[in-house]
């Protein structure tokens, strides 16, 4: 019989044994409740909230999601945050003006980051920084 799920702890144990990163983050998919005008009405407050999360070390990454043809934005976005638990992640997202106002709803999924690479390029002569 095919197995359809396994305990998350089994994955954590395997990752630890392999020496991989094993960094627990939370991915938030946030979607419009149907009215782009409602999203636009709170966009400035939302962006200020996001920058505050970033300054406090909570925000890992965030940004808008385009349509599949990459031509339009319909009010959706993805946020990746650092939190100690799913409950804390929910508390953080409930405080977002987008969700408080009802302009967007959200779904949170725990994400264990194991593989990948971050490359930062710094130009000494100009001070320019580039993330690749």
Task: Tell me the role of every PLM-derived stretch.
Residues 1-132:
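Conserved, structured core segments of small domains
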């Amino acid at each position: 019989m095919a197995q359809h799920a396994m305990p998350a702890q089994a994955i954590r144990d395997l990752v630890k044994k392999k020496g991989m990163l094993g960094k627990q983050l939370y991915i938030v998919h946030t979607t419009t409740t149907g009215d782009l005008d409602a999203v636009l009405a709170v966009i400035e407050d939302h962006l200020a909230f996001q920058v505050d999360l970033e300054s406090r070390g909570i925000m890992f990454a965030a940004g808008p999601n385009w349509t599949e043809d990459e031509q339009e934005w319909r009010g959706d976005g993805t946020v990746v945050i650092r939190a100690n638990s799913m409950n804390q992640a929910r508390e953080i997202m409930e405080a977002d003006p987008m969700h408080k106002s009802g302009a967007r709803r959200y779904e949170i999924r725990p994400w264990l980051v194991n593989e990948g690479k971050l490359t930062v390029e710094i130009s000494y002569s100009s001070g320019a920084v580039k993330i690749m």
